[in-house]
Amino acid sequence: MTDYKNTLNLPETGFPMRGDLAKREPAMLQNWHDKKLYQKIREASKGKRSFILHDGPPYANGNIHLGHAVNHILKDIINKSKTAMGFDTPYVPGWDCHGLPIELKVEGLVGKPNENISASEFRQKCREYAKEQVDGQKADFMRLGILGDWDNPYLTMNFDTEAHIIRTLGKVIANGHLYKGSKPVHWCLDCGSSLAEAEVEYEDKVSPSIYVRFSAVDPVAVEAKFNAQGKGSGQISAVIWTTTPWTLPSNRAIALNSELEYQLVQFGDERVILATELVEAVQKVTGVEQVEVLGSAKGSDLELMRFNHPFYDFSVPFILGDHVTTDGGTGLVHTAPDHGLDDYIVGQKYKLEMAGLVANDGKFISTTPFFAGKGVFETNDLVLEKLKETGALLKLERIKHSYPHCWRHKTPIIFRATPQWFIGMETQGLRKQALGEIKRVRWIPSWGEARIDTMVANRPDWCISRQRTWGVPMTMFVHNETEQLHPRTLEILEEVAKRVEQAGIQAWWDLDPKEVLGEEDAKIYRKVPDTLDVWFDSGSTYASVVQQRPEFNGNSADMYLEGSDQHRGWFMSSLMLSTATDNKAPYNQVLTHGFTVDEKGRKMSKSLGNVIVPSEVWNKNGADILRLWVASTDYTGEIAVSHNILNSAGDTYRRIRNTARFLLANLNGFDPKRDLVKPEEMIALDRWAVSCALDAQNDIKEAYDNYQFHTVVQRLMRFCSIEMGSFYLDIIKDRQYTTKADSLARRSCQTALWHISEALVRWIAPILSFTADEIWGYLPQVEGRSEFVFTEEFYTDLFGLSESDKLDDNYWQKLLKVRAEVNRVLEQARNDKLIGAALEAKVTVYANDDIRPLLEQLGNELGFVLITSQAIVKPLAEADVAEGELAGLAVKVERADGEKCPRCWHYATDIGANAEHAEICGRCVENVVGEGETRNFA
């Protein structure tokens, strides 16, 4: 028996079936590093349109978590897809390196500055610690396959960056946005410092809920205002409600709404003043049964009436404020200008005293009656005792409510007035201009615009000063008596910035004021001891990084991309500073993604045991699986992840890899320069396959352009699984394996596979970067080919069907449906044990007048499309079987005629017709020793 195996064109490739990504990826990374891949991309992109995705700096503390991985993978997908679209996409990764978390870590190692170690040594230790953290995170980001200038990242602690942060402060001052004020700010007792809006979290807290009496100084005058002379009996009191009893020592007024109606009410054996709308609610809370309205008055008529403080020997006025509502409480608001923003604002209007009773450590100062030296929260109970003692406590409850907490310490914070430096939202029209700039930016998803618009519209002035050791100093001098900035402040800032550029921020702390002020001014001006809020550091990177790095060529950022929490963080601080200094937003587009949750929608937490660490994934599955999971998910909402979800991503990966392997294996022996077939000479099915790839590419490019990466993956899977896997690649196996190696039938097919491979590898490169790099190395080599797929643009040699193609896309789509119906009937026959493999079948397709001409066009090649040994087409009227699931079609399956050919596995009736090759069918004889069979369609 002759062995015809060596007459077949069997698929062959060194491209492995298994990805083994965890093992192979590190070697690829090393190759990228050794070959300077990032620099090669920059060189290949010179002169092209730029696209700048500016990296929001992660904080240089701790290992990267899954959220970091999601963020940087999304950025990398965008940069690589933009490169493939013909853009120059320089990417400079960065890190946020100053601030309290690093201070706390270093304190744990070496102790507090100025206690266990000098401040200058402490700063150096902070710098060293931050550098270690950056190096660790950098290695992790690189392991994810993210390309960027990792050798030259930006760090906010780089000397030149620190200098430019100081210069940005100078611009803020020059444009009139900075002022000093004693204003209530979020204050963390554990940090010993003010907090930015973005550093505040809200958690549930149990607090005392109290109703407090302020007795009237002149009860007769009160009766007159309410037109209730001589009515009722007992003491007259204004009743306030609060959940912060410790702020009562700082009370300096009671606020009413000028438009609300208030009533004087007989409340048991006393008389109280309440907002009309809240009388019933307060009665219910206090349990007072006897209630009678004695008179009413408008808030505006009660202004400046005075009431006695509940335990101090002074009285406070009624004042009017728009912030007073009837959403809860009594409609009369306890006002302590030191401890609330609304209180402060209305207090400024009425020139109320700022009591200043609470020190930096959260304890009452030594001159505070009754509470000196006590912490604010322990004072709550002491105040309650005092209120009971004076008879001022009307009602006490305990409630659970949402309360601001420090994001680092997870402890309750307070509002506290301290002397701080602010960027004014109303000065020079900053708020109005920022709101206008928001409208100019493209927000992705679109709801981001309304979110940041509301935040900017309602945000307070930005407190940019901090009382910390490790931070960029506010390099200013103020007058010892007037507290005014030195008249040469801008000049001094630039002089100090130059020194910082050479020696870092320590240059400021080491600076003798006489060096920049002269002998006389140094006597009357002192250094500002504060450092800048770290949000100022990162918020000014549009100036300290984007405007400085040569690869950006002076262009502003096209995109900022971070988690959705950054509307109130980095997006906000960047917008405020850029508008204040440059009169424009620092970005053209802002894209946000959601947070990672488990498959049940729960946050990642150690206590739930659902935390997935990125390194565990790449060590087990490979970084490409992590990248594919990120790309497959709609990042605009919460991003679900679990081991099951990652396994599903692995299944998707295998489908793509198997498709690539089939393509590569069947390009064995193909030399594009020698063997490429012109489109007009290609077989109809092959031309259609290339046109399918063109359609897929157009969809994929559009999805990349719209940052819809899950759509890219879905379209890719449709192409690999439906159009290719279950149709085209299945059909061509016979032609690939059995026709003459150099025949038009085979070379036409290989030409299609070549074009498809060249396109496919570019489609997946932004997402499956390691796998694309691997595929690139196994593709048939052509002259002038780039060493790496990442320097290439999307493939441009795909082509669509021409108008002269009778078998257009509509034709092949109908044929796909016919084939699906035939496969359904074949599967039934297989289940009925009539046949085993499809090639054991002869099918008779009974078709109506619409479908039959389509099938008849293929002639004897219909069997190759249906992958049956014989296929006959007859009118539907002749059918002796019922119509199936496709209207107008009935399919009859019988055992194929003839014997099985050992070479092509088709059943044929002409086996033995050729004496020299009696074992194989006539078609195989033609392909082995003749001119080779002719194919026109499939």
Swiss-Prot record:
Protein residues bound to Zn(2+): C901, C904, C921, C924
Localization terms from the record: Cytoplasm
Residues given in the record as ATP binding sites: K606
Superkingdom of the source species: Bacteria
Cofactor note: Binds 1 zinc ion per subunit.
InterPro entries, sorted: aa-tRNA-synth_I_CS (IPR001412), aa-tRNA-synth_Ia (IPR002300), Anticodon_Ile_BEm (IPR033708), Ile-tRNA-ligase (IPR002301), Ile-tRNA-ligase_type1 (IPR023585), Ile-tRNA_ligase (IPR050081), M/V/L/I-tRNA-synth_anticd-bd (IPR013155), Rossmann-like_a/b/a_fold (IPR014729)
Residues spanned by motif 'KMSKS' region: 603-607
Record's keyword terms, sorted: Aminoacyl-tRNA synthetase, ATP-binding, Cytoplasm, Ligase, Metal-binding, Nucleotide-binding, Protein biosynthesis, Zinc
EC number in record: 6.1.1.5
Gene Ontology CC annotation, any one: cytosol
GO biological process: one example: isoleucyl-tRNA aminoacylation
Primary role: Catalyzes the attachment of isoleucine to tRNA(Ile). As IleRS can inadvertently accommodate and process structurally similar amino acids such as valine, to avoid such errors it has two additional distinct tRNA(Ile)-dependent editing activities. One activity is designated as 'pretransfer' editing and involves the hydrolysis of activated Val-AMP. The other activity is designated 'posttransfer' editing and involves deacylation of mischarged Val-tRNA(Ile).
Family: Belongs to the class-I aminoacyl-tRNA synthetase family. IleS type 1 subfamily.
PANTHER family: ISOLEUCINE--TRNA LIGASE, MITOCHONDRIAL, SOLEUCYL-TRNA SYNTHETASE
Classification via HAMAP family: Ile_tRNA_synth_type1 (MF_02002)
Free-text note on domains in this protein's UniProt record: IleRS has two distinct active sites: one for aminoacylation and one for editing. The misactivated valine is translocated from the active site to the editing site, which sterically excludes the correctly activated isoleucine. The single editing site contains two valyl binding pockets, one specific for each substrate (Val-AMP or Val-tRNA(Ile)).
Subunit structure: Monomer.
Protein name, as recorded: Isoleucine--tRNA ligase
This protein's encoding gene: ileS
